[in-house]
Amino acid sequence: MKKIIALLLAVVMVFALVACASGSKTDAPATDTPATETPAADEAPAAETTGERLYIPVMAKGFQHQFWQAVAAGSAAAAEDYNVEIYFDGPASETEIDAQVNMVKNELAKNPKAMALAALSTDAVTEILEECAEKNIPVIGFDSGVPGDTTGAVKATACTNNENAAAIAADKFNENETVVEAMKNATSDNPVIIGCLSQDAVSASVTGRTTGFVDEMAKIAETYQPGKVSIEGHAKWEKKVDAPAIIIEVAISATTEATAVQTAANSLLGMNPVAIFCSNEGAVTGFLAAVSDGEDLAEGGKYAGLVVAGFDAGAAQKNAVRQGWFYGSVTQDPYQIGYKAVELAVKAANGEAVEDVDTGAQWYDASNIDDEMIALLVYD
């Protein structure tokens, strides 16, 4: 219990720091996959020092979602535990690739001992990674990391296994009576639609979740309607069949902006689906805008009976889950993503061998959202 209270206090303290200045320096800033327990301060080995603490910039994809504030909290806790100095920053939104590149360049000019990076575009930071490799500055990816890096600078990544995490939502749909009965009774004359709403088809984390959900949902659907499951909506996932009884419709918004996601959500809702999975907080935000902040999902509402699962957290999503408007959601452990990113960076800076870390995922719904361990993961 003491550790839980300590973690909660750390989260609250760093949220306050992030709110004041997004780029300020801080001295301390299917089956559910179990979240990794954060090591206590007395369990962390001391960082190698030569009179000054290690300096490690932690460059995020943005502050657009509260997810990143929880990541910042974890990175600050690790900085305190390992006695290192970090600088956590990111662009205002996840569309500002040039802004992130400039931030990373500025930090590289300070010759840090290591760097943690969640790149908006691997291509855009390739030259920076090459310089890191030349200077022997190890890079640790976090969240979606730096997919496809060919420079050798990226030594490991702290992230959720997104495919496994999203598959949890598909498995939960298979436990829902409404969805199961619809799949059992589906016909080619009256096919059942199950939707997947994603804000893009580029980000490694979002595409991984889309793939994980679609593949697992298709596998499940095949057990009810063999040979009659069609995946449609986007070329990256499309596997059409003739006369389908179940259609898994992949809806990708034109941009990551909330209004664009809302438009994609409205199109999906117009197909009269039995269930929809929203693959990140951005998808959830756009979807909720399309259903009157969730009220259209309530009893007597326009979309009452629609089974919806989300991903990540945020105040609006938590409210939808708590109200019973959402069937439930999958949460990553953003605190652990930040913590493990800094932990790996410290180890790499000290010459230790490092490897990828799966930071875990959990399902939460109205029945467990207030449980102590879930409450640590579902940020506002």
Segments the model singles out, each with a brief description of its role:
Residues 2-3, 61:
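A general lysine-centric signal
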Residues 20-380:
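A residue-level marker of the well-folded mature domains of exported/periplasmic proteins
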Residues 4-23:
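Sec-dependent N-terminal signal peptides of Gram-positive bacterial secreted proteins and lipoproteins
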